[in-house]
């Protein structure tokens, strides 16, 4: 399996264990979906080759959306849970993983008719 897909699948399965019925992928959920929810977004695989070896990084973006901007603590806790799942990852079926960097943003989101709170995690994993 492609390493990027293997990481994506692992995160999706583990997050669904923590938040059943609140984790989505591929497309954002329909308009009537209850908040808060997690959206496992885009991922990127980068090869870094030198003369004798290839090193790889996978970057994974995960979003948390909430329709109550006053409940920032809920978004923050969900982001923390996602980071814990990411840090606990050591191995998948075919690869050994290490979480290298995490960037976290929480911001207002006015892309819908109701104001949202939008949390974004950018996760950088190394694997071999």
Listing of model-derived features with the role each one plays in the protein:
Residues 69-76:
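Short, conserved charged micro-motifs
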Residues 58-65:
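Active-site-adjacent structural patch at catalytic or cofactor/ligand-binding sites
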